[in-house]
Regions:
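Juxtamembrane low-complexity tails/linkers enriched in Ser/Thr-Pro and polybasic
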Residues: 1-10
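A short amphipathic beta-strand at an alpha->beta junction
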Residues: 48, 56, 121-148, 165, ...
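Short, non-transmembrane amphipathic alpha-helical segments
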Residues: 66-71, 75-78, 107-132, 175-180, ...
Length: 255
């Protein structure tokens, strides 16, 4: 389909997704957190203030790799009061890989916070062995306040369905097959996001600049969503057209 040629593959642009300011508002920076964590888990210092603690079968090398990725993508920025920056926890075991972030009280209830940290997880997953991973938001007592799966399914031709939140690999695989059957996926390397959260199911298509202003393209995406919807669990589905920086340019609910 022509809209694939106009876009469809995103880059490593989570800061352009509007996450920079949001991250600063919700991460917990405290020397007390470091003291608590240091009594329980080994850690790797990134820069002079930020730290990755690791447990289970995760290694020091894993923690260093994750820390480097978080720094490269702007999450770790060597800032914070009292000489302490941000803390992140990496765990590996029989249940897979989990990355946990300490966040300010109540921040997990803010709009788009789930998407914000899922995108961070998507960016750094290759540094800890790849998909899938679990992303958790914790309070200062280490209680899990929010948890999301971040995974991907790659189809023939390098088209990718990312599945987020409560969405599963089998749902992403089924959606990918449906998108192929309905000629959306054509082996040109398109990216689609399937998200399931408390507010329902969202299907996001990465498109080229201006595609969201073209009525014919929009109608095409509406049709594809209705056709592929059963593979994602059925309608209604929130349809979103996003640019290659994952900024939502058009959204509607498809019934």
């Amino acid at each position: 389909m022509e809209h694939i040629q106009q876009g469809g593959r995103l880059g490593s642009k989570w800061m352009a997704f509007g996450l920079g300011a949001g991250i600063c508002a919700v991460i917990f920076l405290s020397v007390f957190m470091a003291t608590y964590a240091a009594d329980h888990q080994p850690g790797v210092l990134i820069g002079t203030k930020d730290e990755v603690y690791y447990s289970g079968t995760a290694t020091k090398e894993d923690a260093q790799s994750l820390g480097n990725a978080l720094k490269a993508h702007g999450y770790f920025n060597d800032e914070g009061a009292s000489g302490k920056g941000a803390d992140v926890f990496l765990a590996k075991g029989k249940d897979g890989t989990t990355i946990s972030f300490i966040t300010k009280e109540g921040s997990w209830e803010q709009p788009r916070i789930d998407s914000l940290f899922e995108e961070i997880g998507r960016e750094v997953a290759p540094s800890v062995g790849g998909f899938p991973i679990q992303v958790r938001l914790l309070n200062i007592q280490h209680d899990v306040k929010q948890e999301s799966t971040v995974g991907s399914v790659t189809l023939a031709g390098n088209d990718v369905v990312y599945y987020l939140g409560a969405a599963t690999a089998s749902e992403a695989q089924a959606l990918g097959k449906a998108l192929t059957a309905h000629e959306f996926f054509s082996g040109k390397g398109a990216d689609v996001f399937l998200s399931k959260h408390n507010d329902g199911t969202t299907l996001s298509f990465v498109v080229g600049d201006g595609a969201w202003n073209n009525p014919a393209f929009v109608a095409d995406f509406e049709r594809i969503t209705r056709q592929a919807g059963p593979a994602a669990g059925g309608l209604p589905i929130r349809l979103r057209l996003v640019n290659t920086s994952l900024q939502v340019k058009k959204g509607e609910v498809i019934h």
